[in-house]
UniProtKB/Swiss-Prot annotation:
It comes from Conus arenatus (Sand-dusted cone). Disulfide bonds join C50-C63, C57-C68, C62-C77. The keyword Lipid metabolism does not apply. This is Conotoxin ArMKLT2-0321. It is found in: Secreted. It comes from the Eukaryota. Residues 22-48 form a propeptide. Pfam families: Conotoxin (PF02950). Residues 1-21 form the signal peptide. GO terms for molecular function: ion channel inhibitor activity; toxin activity.
């Protein structure tokens, strides 16, 4: 009887630890992805001279294959 109780408690403890670890790893992975995305955006070598799709075209022209749609100050680069 005591052995059965100890085994049940041990299994519950292991299950809780496993679930807790799984939850922590997904949060860290999402955070890591956001951090990597921000680092890529801020990388000095990645400065573009043209706007990509969905970006504003008030301060710089749209990239090749895109045109400025909407009013010039508030327009967005869209595919032709």
């Amino acid at each position: 009887m005591k052995l059965t109780c100890v085994l049940i408690i041990a299994m519950l403890f292991l299950i809780v630890c496993q679930l807790n670890t799984a939850d922590d790893s997904t949060d860290k992975q999402e955070y890591r992805a956001v951090k990597l995305r921000d680092a890529m955006r801020n990388f000095k070598g990645s400065k573009r001279n043209c706007g990509e799709q969905g970006e504003g075209c008030a301060t710089r022209p749209c990239c090749a294959g895109l045109s400025c749609v909407g009013s010039r100050p508030g327009g967005l680069c869209q595919y032709d």
